[in-house]
A protein has these predicted regions:
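PLD/PLD-like phosphodiesterase catalytic module centered on the HKD motif
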Residues: 1-235
Length: 237
């Protein structure tokens, strides 16, 4: 019951009256990587990973630079047997095969790939009867986690909360989608070959990769940026 009051007070401070006293740990907040408050999304993710009992991530783009700062905490989760799920994508064929291979090294993490235009960025951490959710603009890239000015909203909820239920429902729908495949070594090799043959420097690939082993339903062409636009997009992530 005491924790109920913490969540209610936190919501009042965030959405009703900023002068209401509340525990900052239960208060919805905006994470921007601002140097003023010294709070980066990377530091928040490390904290949540370290204290969670399970986690679900839905992130379109994952780069080596985004995984590397999390290696230590992810290895700790593996040693502790903490289970997690990561749903990523082949959108714009941004993710490198090496990143997928790295994710496969964590046997405690179930990884699936949505083969289509999925651009979500959401992080869910469960700790007891309370979950922490972060939804916003940051993919798992170094700049998006540390120095880019991003907008990521963090909130906490009981499992019975409506907002959390909506987020989990969307995650489960994408997780079970016919456009989603289980990450495997065979899939990674197929994806690697696809990128080699389709990503021509002078003419960017206009189709998102879809494994030949999976029948894709309603997969349409997506607009791809040119080389200079791609470099600009990477700098923004």
């Amino acid at each position: 019951m005491e924790r109920d009051s913490f969540l209610v007070a936190g919501a009042q401070t965030a959405f009703v009256d900023a002068s209401v006293a509340s525990d900052e740990r239960y208060r919805p907040s905006l994470i921007t990587n601002s140097q003023v408050d010294g709070c980066s999304l990377l530091s928040v993710l490390k904290r949540e990973f370290s204290s969670c009992s399970s986690f679900d991530l839905c992130v379109a783009f994952i780069a080596d630079t985004g995984l590397q700062p999390l290696v230590q905490v992810l290895s700790s989760l593996r040693q502790r047997g903490v289970k997690g799920r990561i749903l990523t994508s082949t959108y714009l064929n941004f993710n490198r095969p090496e990143v997928f291979a790295k994710l496969l090294e964590y046997e405690n993490i179930d990884v699936r790939v949505y083969q289509g235009s999925m651009h979500a960025k959401g992080y869910m951490f469960k700790q007891g009867d309370v979950s922490t959710v972060i939804i916003g603009s940051s993919n798992l890239t170094q700049t998006a986690l540390t120095c880019n000015r991003e907008w990521n909203v963090l909130f906490r909820s009981y499992e019975t909360g409506d907002m959390l239920a909506s987020v989990r429902s969307e995650f489960e729908e994408l997780w079970a989608s016919s456009d989603t495949v289980q990450l495997s070594k065979a899939w990674i090799e197929e994806y690697r070959e696809y990128r080699k043959t389709h990503q021509v420097k002078s003419a960017p690939n206009k189709k998102t990769f879809v494994s030949n082993a999976v029948e894709a339903l309603g997969t349409d062409d997506v607009i791809c940026p040119n080389k200079m636009q791609s470099m600009a997009l990477e700098a923004l992530k």
